[in-house]
Amino acid sequence: CKSKSDVSLVKIARKYFDNKLHKGETVYFELVGYMNGSLVKKPYDNSKLEPFMFPGGYGDFIKRYGKKSKFHYGCTNSYKIYVYRITHTDSDNIITDYSWQQVKSRCKQIGVKHVPEMNNIEISEDTSFVPAERESVLDLAEYQCNSESSNFPDHLKEGVCVRIENEDHDPI
């Protein structure tokens, strides 16, 4: 976490990325925690979740997380950045997404964190397995969404992102 002293998103981007990016690189990142004394993401009213919970579950939920969720990501009056995507734009304005492995490698070179990686699954090229593998990916994503966060246990998990990479499709 970095200090909360008067900062702007532009100052943060310059601090972390000036003179560190290759020509044509664009870095996409999420800012979490506190900026200028306020949470980056406003507290969420947990009462809106009650209709979606099992009977009796809401009371336990409120005991655990409180009436409002504060998405601080372990920061106390400070912030962190997490990179989730890096692209390269060539001289013909063709944009290419870096693979996840390349994103992790560039983050290490630049000295910044990437979003937490929960799992990495390789799906076989044998198309007869695709429906079963698709189901296993969906099951894993559902499990990750419904389980407590191991990275930030003090608050709700906001969700998970499934990134698909292959030669036939752009990463998503």
Predicted regions and their residues:
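Core nucleotide-handling region used for phosphoryl-transfer chemistry
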Residues: 1-172
